[in-house]
Amino acid sequence: MKAISPVRSMSSCYQAVCCLSEQSLSIARGSSLKGAGIDETMGLLYDMNGCYSKLKELVPGIPQGSKLSQVEILQHVIDYIFDLQIVLGEDQQQNSILNLQKSDFSELATQGDARVCH
């Protein structure tokens, strides 16, 4: 017989109490641990499907209303992240070039001012 953790890590006390009461009811009814494991597995599967649906909504470039496999959704997500990294890299590169140009210009300006004054 496997041990069941009486309290799962949950954000609120209310959810922990509900979890305990559900476990107590399943023990009192005499349900097997396998049934609880299957229910938990199905719950995780539905959660993952929900996550894939949310990714389809959030990531641009994924055609809405089309049936895509989970692998295809993940590939779109990876491509989108890669595109974001490229854009952020270009922005950082442009900012560093602008900062370099500003520093060169300010150095030239101070040298030019010195020449004018002398």
Swiss-Prot record:
* GO process terms (BP): circadian regulation of gene expression; negative regulation of DNA binding; negative regulation of DNA-templated transcription; negative regulation of transcription by RNA polymerase II; neural crest formation; neuron differentiation; regulation of cell cycle
Q: Where is the bHLH domain?
A: 32-84
Pfam families under this entry? HLH
**MF terms (GO), sorted A to Z:** bHLH transcription factor binding; protein dimerization activity; transcription corepressor activity
What domain of life does the native source organism fall in? Eukaryota
Q: What does this protein do?
A: Transcriptional regulator (lacking a basic DNA binding domain) which negatively regulates the basic helix-loop-helix (bHLH) transcription factors by forming heterodimers and inhibiting their DNA binding and transcriptional activity. Influences cell fate decisions in the embryo by sequestering and blocking the activity of the bHLH transcription factors that control these decisions. Inhibits the binding of myogenic bHLH-containing complexes to E-box DNA, thereby preventing activation of muscle-specific target genes. Also inhibits the activity of neurogenic factor neurod1/neuroD.
Q: How does it assemble?
A: Homodimer. Heterodimer with other HLH proteins. Interacts (via HLH domain) with the bHLH protein hes4/hairy2 (via Orange domain). Interacts with stat3.
What's the protein here called?
A: DNA-binding protein inhibitor ID-3-B
Q: Which organism is it from?
A: Xenopus laevis (African clawed frog)
